[in-house]
């Protein structure tokens, strides 16, 4: 069985109501559900939430709901724990072998049917991969450019320049270190053992396992701030 799980809670801290904000005449949380509904592989769609509005919006997509316990419905709860709990509840109910999970987020609308089906196809065709996840190339946000504040109040490299090879080959050109692929959180297609063995996965999104294939996209990202909305609108207009 192949399933999709979308997670999203009420009470966002930074951008209030981000999961249910309107983007191009649809709610943010609708886009992942539309993509999952159109997939030719997904058997069932589940929504893990404590938000009445997300439930109301999701009903028309014929999803099944997983109520979140209070300990997983606050700002300190990790996505990995919510996915693991949701997976456990589904296993208890259906007692069927789940081969692949499509993990979605209510605040990550830059996803479509093509991306989901490509991710599933990658895992079906190549057993060496633990997962396939959507990626966007953001060279302008390379770790090479990242800084942190020192105790003296000065900006210093976040990671040693030697991490990227010979520092003499690097420069201010955003492309000098090569392409920088970010897992943009639009979709993670994972084998079930990645959830079972979550602790063994790579940081920071341990549900992806260790051997991760890219689902190449562009301009994706989960929405945490209102200023991201125009970028997502642009993506949606160009990926209908």
Regions from the PLM with identified roles:
Residues 55, 195-196, 229:
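A generic structural signal for short hydrophobic patches within well-formed alpha-helices
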Residues 46, 52-102, 110-111, 115-118:
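Short phosphate-binding loop-to-helix
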Residues 21-22, 47:
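Conserved SAM-binding loop
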Residues 81, 109-203, 215-216:
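Conserved core of the sugar-phosphate nucleotidyltransferase
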